């Protein structure tokens, strides 16, 4: 399922969509991969949280810092034995090569019941030769994701999420009624 929403994005819209995708998570665990400062994930209400980033980040919610793990996400996931309820990667996979991005998504599907990713739409500020972790190394579209994970994910495409480029959510959630979900998203964004 792919739904296009022609709205300019904001943190509030991001949070509304995430809350709708996740539902009640008061008894659920989450791993936030390539978390950056994780401004929104703490607001979703997960009972158990793990934040992983390769750089020593200070999280926006200071009380969450105790759950931060300084690690390469691949090292962390390859050594992990836990299955999380949710694995989230917001503005992360574009910082990896395509090959590593597909590898990350695959690890997420193996180590969580539900996966949610959010990334810029297409190639934006991409420098494939860069080595710094904050640089975009790939650009993604639903077609690229579907090429590797045919029919696995649902999509919300927002071509005007940012002022100069779009973004999209893609997710798989076992307990989500896709028909009602689209109606809920549209209702929540009005």
Describe the function of each predicted region.
Residues 1-82, 86-88, 99-106, 111, ...:
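Conserved N-terminal segment of class I S-adenosyl-L-methionine
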Residues 37, 120-126, 139:
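Short "lid" loop at the C-terminus of a central beta-strand within the Rossmann-like core
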Residues 92-95, 120-121:
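Hydrophobic adenine-recognition pocket in adenosine-nucleotide-binding enzymes
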Residues 93, 133-134:
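A generic structural signal for short
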Residues 112-122:
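Conserved beta-strand signature within the Rossmann-like core of class I S-adenosyl-L-methionine
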Residues 126-132:
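Short glycine/proline- and charge-enriched loop/turn segments
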């Amino acid at each position: 399922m792919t739904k296009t929403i022609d709205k300019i994005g904001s943190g509030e819209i991001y949070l509304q969509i995430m809350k709708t995708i996740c539902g009640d998570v008061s008894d659920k665990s989450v791993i936030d991969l390539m978390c950056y400062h994780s401004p929104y994930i703490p607001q979703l209400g997960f009972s158990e949280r793990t934040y992983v980033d390769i750089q020593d980040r200070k999280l926006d919610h200071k009380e969450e810092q105790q759950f931060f793990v300084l690690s390469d996400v691949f090292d962390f996931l390859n050594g992990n034995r836990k299955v999380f309820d949710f694995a989230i990667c917001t503005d992360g996979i574009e910082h990896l090569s395509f090959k590593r991005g597909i590898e990350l998504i695959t690890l997420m599907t193996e180590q969580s019941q539900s996966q949610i990713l959010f990334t810029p739409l297409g190639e934006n500020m991409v420098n494939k030769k860069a080595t710094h972790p904050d640089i975009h190394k790939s650009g993604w579209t639903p077609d690229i994701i579907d090429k590797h994970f045919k029919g696995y994910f649902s999509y919300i495409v927002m071509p005007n999420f940012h002022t100069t480029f779009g973004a999209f959510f893609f997710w798989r959630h076992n307990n989500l009624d896709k028909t009602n979900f689209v109606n809920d998203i549209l209702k929540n964004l009005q």
